[in-house]
């Protein structure tokens, strides 16, 4: 296992661990980290299958002659009281085992805390975000790991720095979304999106929906389909992010009762909920719980968004809306899933709108199109939250069938 932080560099050999370590299941090899097993460290942590030996003082929120409770720093690092640590951390044979983060995450944090100017990995950490040629998935994950753990440890200044680096990387979102993203990383992104900075939170959720967007024919790639099912099937995702769970729910719902995914990947209880949603979620423009009147009535003065444009660009904004979001149609179909299968294309039309308003030929200098786009992003987030609430209501209903559900849908369980 590499102890390095950049996959472009060949990893050095890992240091062996003394043979007095306790037996581990499945013959898991325990190794010392080749960089952050410090000879004079005071505490040994086992994270994944890697031992780190560090001074706990590096985990304090701010450096200085303060009397910190290092146990509280460890509790913050663990992050979840429901996942107790084991071991005392006094030796390799009795390490303090932490299961709520990965060795990769901790290694990235230590790079930020212990790196030195001149070290190539540390210099890359300081500069990669500023160079779009280096905007890779590995670099994105590095800043994400640092930001999440800094948040956890209350290192607010460093968390803000990681936040700004990610903002720079999101300028290359189009190339990043082409990569395969695992569920753990997607949930990490959603976790970091729980920030008071609404604009940054919206950017991260836009990015997540772009990762989980079907092709123009409405089909998800096999990896993305498995990812959606994994996210939908995890109660932890709902706890962390209603927006992410709601979007995963919509995508899984769009597959329909005849899909192999429903019949082979989902439990009976999940299928009951989806059947009920399939029957109930028709004529979405009139489906009050979803709250998308702004989408289908953009010129409506109360809920529509086109009124945000000025007299110079109002006609251009309206035309741009019609050729992007307008392609969703009226969303008034009574056929099960017709409207749902239109709505899953929302991220694609959002990107088309964003590209159009960034044109240098835009008729006004007030950036009205950008104001509309920010409102669109906030409304889509709210829609995804509403989808989570709709799902929760269906779960509460006996048998997963809401009193508002239609009839005539084949409930083949």
Residues covered by each model-derived region:
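Active-site/pore-lining binding-face segments in mid-to-C-terminal subdomains
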Residues: 241-336
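Short linear motifs in intrinsically disordered/low-complexity regions
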Residues: 7, 15-16, 21, 183, ...
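BTB/POZ (also called T1 in voltage-gated K+ channels) oligomerization domain detector
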Residues: 1-133, 308-413
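Post-BTB helical module
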Residues: 111, 115-253, 258, 262, ...
């Amino acid at each position: 296992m590499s102890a390095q932080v950049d996959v472009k560099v060949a990893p050095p050999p890992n240091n062996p661990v003394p043979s007095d370590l306790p037996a581990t299941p499945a013959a898991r090899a325990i190794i010392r980290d080749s960089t952050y097993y410090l000879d004079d460290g005071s505490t040994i942590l086992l994270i994944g299958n890697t031992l780190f030996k560090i001074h706990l003082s590096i985990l304090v929120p701010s450096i200085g002659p303060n009397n910190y409770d290092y146990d509280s720093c460890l509790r913050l690092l663990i992050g979840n009281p429901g996942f107790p640590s084991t071991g005392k951390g006094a030796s390799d044979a009795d390490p303090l085992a932490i299961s709520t983060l990965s060795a990769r995450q901790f290694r990235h944090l230590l790079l930020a805390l212990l790196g030195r100017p001149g070290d190539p990995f540390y210099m890359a950490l300081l500069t990669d975000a500023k160079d779009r040629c280096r905007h890779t998935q590995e670099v994105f994950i590095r800043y994400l790991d640092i930001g999440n753990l800094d948040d956890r440890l209350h290192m607010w200044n460093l968390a803000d720095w990681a936040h700004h680096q990610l903002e720079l990387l999101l300028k290359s979102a189009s190339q990043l979304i082409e990569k395969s993203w695992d569920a753990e990383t997607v949930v990490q992104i959603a976790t970091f999106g729980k920030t008071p900075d609404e604009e940054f939170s919206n950017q991260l959720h836009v990015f997540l929906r772009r990762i989980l967007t079907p092709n123009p024919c409405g089909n998800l790639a096999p990896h993305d389909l498995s990812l959606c099912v994994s996210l939908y099937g995890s109660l932890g995702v709902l706890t962390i992010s209603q927006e992410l769970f709601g979007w995963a729910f919509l995508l899984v719902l769009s597959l329909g009762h005849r899909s192999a995914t429903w019949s082979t990947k989902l439990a009976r209880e999940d299928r009951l909920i989806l059947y009920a949603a399939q029957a109930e979620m028709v004529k979405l423009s009139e489906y009050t719980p979803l709250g998308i009147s702004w989408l289908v009535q953009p010129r409506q003065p109360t809920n529509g968004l086109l009124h945000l444009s000025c007299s110079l660009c109002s006609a251009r904004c309206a035309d741009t809306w019609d050729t992007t979001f307008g392609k969703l149609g009226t969303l008034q179909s009574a056929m099960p899933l017709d409207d749902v299968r239109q709505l899953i294309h929302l991220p694609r039309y959002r990107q088309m709108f964003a590209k159009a308003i960034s044109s240098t030929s835009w008729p006004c200098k007030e950036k009205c199109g950008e104001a509309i786009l920010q409102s669109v992003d906030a409304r889509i987030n709210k829609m995804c939250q509403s989808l989570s609430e709709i799902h929760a209501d269906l779960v509460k209903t006996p048998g997963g069938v809401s009193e508002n559900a239609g009839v005539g849908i084949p409930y083949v369980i």
